[in-house]
């Protein structure tokens, strides 16, 4: 009987110990029904939201500043549209077409499909350098002024130089009294177009009725 009593006493002691440990673990949970928040490490900056007791929001990610677009880019004394692509913006220069603009972009190592207004100044300077020396960067058969009258050189004119050269050529044709020069003097079409209905110059002649017709119309009105 003594052995049985010893065993029962040991079981009771173990049961009491387990109850004590369980009560000790459940003690912090009973206070307020929430676990206590862990204390921040010493020296760490405390969050304002944590001080107030609310949930803090994540700080917004810093937005990268976007490059400002230049709406007007000046190249070769011409204001170009900065919202267009490079290959189309360069065609705004008189004397430069689509094909030459693509060649200029390739020679300057600039993306022809990039927006002109977003190009850095270094790439814009490269475009200017290629345009200033087009004779070396463009095939001879693409130049717009081959075998110049005065110098005999192959050139590519653009901008104001092109307009002045065209005016000088017309003045030369007028001085030598060529057919084209005479047509330019008279303000008529130069390239053989018909002028029966279009291209007429001078004052328009109105329709004039004859005196007899006017008198007959007046008599008819009197009879009525």
Swiss-Prot record:
Gene name of the encoded protein: rps13
Q: Provide the Gene Ontology terms for cellular component.
A: cytosol; small ribosomal subunit
- Composition bias type Basic and acidic residues, residue spans: 1-17, 210-224
InterPro entries, per the entry: Rbsml_uS13_C, Ribosomal_uS13, Ribosomal_uS13-like_H2TH, Ribosomal_uS13_archaeal, Ribosomal_uS13_CS
Name the record gives this protein: Small ribosomal subunit protein uS13
Extract the NCBIfam families matched here: PRK04053.1, uS13_arch
Question: Looking at the keywords, is RNA-binding present?
Answer: yes
* SUBUNIT field: Part of the 30S ribosomal subunit. Forms a loose heterodimer with protein S19. Forms two bridges to the 50S subunit in the 70S ribosome.
Q: Which domain of life is it from?
A: Archaea
| Signal peptide stretch | none
Q: Which Gene3D superfamilies match?
A: 1.10.8.50, 30s ribosomal protein s13, domain 2
Q: Give me the ranges of the annotated region Disordered.
A: 1-64, 184-224
What are this entry's molecular-function GO terms? rRNA binding; structural constituent of ribosome
Annotated function: Located at the top of the head of the 30S subunit, it contacts several helices of the 16S rRNA. In the 70S ribosome it contacts the 23S rRNA (bridge B1a) and protein L5 of the 50S subunit (bridge B1b), connecting the 2 subunits; these bridges are implicated in subunit movement.
